[in-house]
A protein has these predicted regions:
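Conserved small/polar residues in nucleotide/adenosyl-binding loops
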Residues: 532-539
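A short, aliphatic-rich beta-strand micro-motif
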Residues: 397, 401, 405-414
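Bacterial carbohydrate/catabolite-sensing allosteric modules
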Residues: 1-317
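Conserved nucleotide-binding and Mg2+-coordinating catalytic segments in signaling enzymes
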Residues: 462-485, 505-521, 527
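Structured interaction and signal-relay segments at domain junctions
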Residues: 347-396
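Helix-loop-beta substructure at the N-terminus of cytosolic sensory domains
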Residues: 321-365
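Signal-transducing coiled-coil linker helices
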Residues: 307-318, 328, 420-473, 480-491
Length: 546
């Protein structure tokens, strides 16, 4: 059984499960026994940088040298420091690393051949449609795929004999609002319209086309637009957007092919620059592709809307039920029941000791993990039901004992940037159709933090009560405890005809000792007497009555 680690950052609050499916399905097709450990982070969703740090802390959990290969996906990561940190970390390991869509020295690359594919788009616009003025409507300037598409843009202009000027390219994000901003800013600037806006992806293209319509322009009559990635919004938009397929389904399998060649010493272990289909459509002046069934699409939208409403209702019910849980075990059990009601084979929860004990002086880590400071708080799977493990090492050994291809997905448990543990989902296939697992995880995190604070308060109150009821010198119950606990208990027992007795022991000449030798000698005398009397009463029921 080969162990593969997949480190991937989600798109906003969504999990990118297509890489997992590609690896798991590819392992069957290639005849490989694979156990995939998927470390999923969602560090691009929150506006709270400390929360995002808590997400990315998960990347420090795995011992990467213990794997047979690592797959790295930072295509959604917007934090450059995090990307650079992970690249340095991965460059130091002694196992092969395959990087998805991001070329790094020393790593194998799997992804679209962005330069060649973007050049296909430009050549089509130049030769088939006679475009002479071009604008690159780009994504983030640091993003590798965006950079490659921009390189293709510049090389094509040079080959066409068109000089590059600063007003011929724009950089932003990969989202719809970036396209909205590009079109709005261009309109307000009063600059002449280009023949074509070449967008770095379909989100930008859709935002640009929609805003153009609001501003009174017609695409492709007034100018043409192209996209990239072949998202649904390209195929079903009006006008249908010219695009390039993304190869999502093939990337995971191609990564596995590289590993297989390395493991077996045969086959092609070189970078995989994937070819994809160029799909001309209405936004560039070509006819509709005719590939889409609009009625079925509308039907699926309606069904999807109903399903989303049901899911949102279910999550709201789950949130309510989680809020009613007053013990960690009950909380994780309810969470597990919900997750396993979908396509998921098991849930395991690991927490740090300070979380488990709800210590009021808890010092949670912000970097790194210590397996000796972790406990298994909950474990349940469809093979063996409820499970108990004495240590996290025992859980890890259990997970590695699988005899079939398995995926374990890890999610961070954290209070902002403070690490409190992690959740492991076994074969969470539901994520392919329901990638919004982050909403469920957020509900769990919220209740877990509140429950921790509640337990800390309870423990603190118990500690204060213990101090209040006990003598500071001897640790015995004091007069307050006698008045508030013992006497009421006697009254209850006497009402039940149970006889009770209090025995008082007096220390002879105690006052003289205090007066003659000082109170410190009197204190020592009391503690000495306690040594002789402690073993006598059953259940150690003694008290000091000064």
């Amino acid at each position: 059984m080969k162990k593969i680690a997949l480190l991937a950052d989600g798109w906003r609050r969504y999990v990118i499960y297509s890489w997992v499916e590609g690896i798991m399905e590819g392992s069957k097709e290639l005849g490989l026994d694979v156990c995939l450990y998927f470390y999923n982070t969602n560090g691009t969703w929150s506006q709270d940088s400390k929360f995002n740090k808590g997400e990315y802390a998960l990347n420090d959990l795995p011992d990467l040298n213990s794997f047979d290969g690592v797959v790295f996906d930072c295509t959604n990561t917007t934090n450059l420091d995090e990307i650079q940190y992970m690249v340095r970390k991965l460059q130091s390991v002694n196992v092969p690393v395959v990087s998805i869509g991001y070329k790094v020295d020393g790593f194998y690359y799997v992804g679209n051949d962005n330069k060649r594919l973007f050049r296909k788009v430009m050549d089509h616009m130049y030769y088939a449609h006679g475009c002479k003025s071009f604008v690159f409507a780009g994504g983030p300037p640091y993003h590798y795929e965006n950079r490659m598409r921009f390189e293709a843009f510049k090389e094509a202009l040079s080959d066409y004999g068109i000089p590059l000027t600063a007003d011929m390219y724009m950089f932003g994000d990969f989202d719809y609002q970036t396209g909205v901003r590009y079109m709005s800013d261009w309109h307000e600037s009063k600059k002449p319209l280009p023949d074509v806006f070449l967008c770095a992806n379909d989100n930008i293209a859709a935002g640009l086309c929609a805003t153009a319509e609001v501003l009174g322009y017609k695409v492709p009559q007034d100018f043409k637009v192209t996209g990239f990635d072949n998202l649904d919004k390209a195929a079903y938009f009006n006008p249908q957007i010219t695009t390039v397929d993304n190869n999502r389904g093939n990337i995971g399998r191609n990564a596995l092919e590289i590993f297989k060649a390395l493991w077996n010493g045969t086959g092609d272990a070189s970078d995989k620059y994937l070819d994809s289909e160029f799909i001309p459509a209405e936004s560039c002046g070509c006819p509709n592709t005719g590939r889409v069934d609009y009625r079925n699409y509308i039907k699926n939208i309606i069904k999807g809307s109903v399903a989303r409403e049901q899911e949102e209702d279910a999550v709201m019910i789950l949130q309510k039920e989680l809020e009613e849980c007053n013990e960690y075990y009950d909380l994780f059990e309810r969470y597990s029941d919900y997750i396993q009601s979908m396509k998921c084979d098991g849930v395991y929860v690991v927490g740090v000791s300070d979380l488990a004990a709800a210590r009021n002086n808890a010092q949670f880590r912000k970097h790194g993990y210590d397996i000796d400071d972790e406990v298994v708080l909950y474990a349940d799977d469809k093979d063996n039901g409820k499970l108990e493990f004495k240590s996290v090492n025992d859980l890890m050994q259990y997970m590695q004992s699988v005899d079939k291809n398995t995926c374990y997905m890890y999610c961070s448990l954290h209070f902002r940037d403070e690490i409190v543990g992690y959740v492991i989902l076994r074969n969470p296939e539901f994520l392919y159709d329901h990638p919004e697992q982050f909403d469920i995880q957020s509900a769990l995190l919220k209740r877990l933090e509140n429950l921790f604070k509640q337990k800390v308060l309870e423990n603190t109150n118990n500690e204060l009560k213990n101090l209040y009821n006990h003598d500071a010198l001897t640790g015995l119950y004091n007069r307050v405890a006698c008045n508030e606990m013992v006497i009421p208990m006697f009254a209850e027992l006497e009402a039940q005809n149970v006889g009770c007795t209090i025995v008082f022991l007096d220390v002879d000449d105690f006052k003289d000792i205090n007066d003659t030798y000082g109170h410190q000698y009197g204190d020592e005398l009391l503690k000495t007497c306690l040594l002789y009397t402690s073993p006598s009463p059953r259940d150690n029921r003694q008290s000091r009555m000064p």
